[in-house]
Amino acid sequence: MFEIIFIGVGGGAPNKRGLPGILIRREGFEILLDCGEGTQNKMIEHSISFMKLNLIGISHLHGDHVLGLPGIIQTMAMYSRQQKLLLMGPTTLQDYLKSSSKHTYFKPGFETEFIQSYEDQNLTITTFRTCHTIESYGFLIKEKDKTKVDAERLKKEGITDWRIIRKLKEGKRVEIDTKVFLPEDYLYVKKGLSIAYTGDTAPCDSVLNAIKGVDLLIHDSTFLNEREAHDYGHSNCTDAAEIASKADVKRLALYHISGRYQTTEPLLKEAKKIFERTFLPEPLSYFILQEE
């Protein structure tokens, strides 16, 4: 299960929807995707701890996605953070943070590590290229598949001995009173949940190929239906819906909405004509992604 807080959902100049920042939690591991100006202020105002963050991923170095990052790192240090902070993003991200630290005369008192991908016993986090006007990446967060025992079948057949169940889970065959129990008859694979976040992007094959079949796609939907959207390296809400449909994703969240729109209803309405399982999160809205 993933818990997702859409801290800011707008894009471009600061606006009432806030700038990009998405908090994703899974069993004590916390990820922040993008960190626009004002992200830490929103977190403080609504009692969302940034001290618990394990990893921050930055899609690209346009200001609305990254200007909040130096500030949140400095505040972490002021609050005496000791835990290492993992960072993922474009090749220029490290230079940006070094320059920011140098010219604000500040050095974090904790370790930061720049990584290209992340893996632990439960999760993998990887990036994929998106099609924006500068170097830019999307993020793919996936739970690992788990091998499970069919408890109902074992119960029906009267198998309750934990030693037998353990052997089956280990992939070993078990023989009891001449009856043979094969692991493949009692094991199944539980597919892990997955989230894809595009950051800013025009529609392109590299995005489509990376996000196929994800449970939740958070896609650039800057505009309603502007001819210039692709020239700016952005997508219309209808582009996002078409990609969601082609990629056979489970749910679509429209994201990075331009401040020019006073209401988001037309964007959601147009997208849902193409892909029904679409929603448009409000700033600071909370979403739980779990098995259906």
Curated annotation (Swiss-Prot):
Subunit structure: Homodimer.
HAMAP family: RNase_Z_BN
Protein EC: 3.1.26.11
Binding positions for Zn(2+) 1 per the UniProt entry: 60, 62, 132, 200
Keywords of this entry: Endonuclease, Hydrolase, Metal-binding, Nuclease, tRNA processing, Zinc
Its job: Zinc phosphodiesterase, which displays some tRNA 3'-processing endonuclease activity. Probably involved in tRNA maturation, by removing a 3'-trailer from precursor tRNA.
Class of the enzyme per the UniProt entry, highest EC level: hydrolase
CDD domains linked to this entry: RNaseZ_ZiPD-like_MBL-fold (cd07717)
Note describing how the cofactor binds: Binds 2 Zn(2+) ions.
GO terms of molecular function: 3'-tRNA processing endoribonuclease activity; zinc ion binding
Residues bound to Zn(2+) 2: 64-65, 200, 256
Family: Belongs to the RNase Z family.
Catalysed transformations (reactions): Endonucleolytic cleavage of RNA, removing extra 3' nucleotides from tRNA precursor, generating 3' termini of tRNAs. A 3'-hydroxy group is left at the tRNA terminus and a 5'-phosphoryl group is left at the trailer molecule
Cysteines paired by S-S bonds: none
Cofactor(s) in the UniProt record: Zn(2+)
Designated name of the protein: Ribonuclease Z
Active-site residues per Swiss-Prot or TrEMBL entry: 64 (proton acceptor)
InterPro entries: Metallo-B-lactamas, RibonucZ/Hydroxyglut_hydro, RNase_Z/BN
Nuclease found in the keyword field: yes
Keyword set includes Transmembrane helix: no
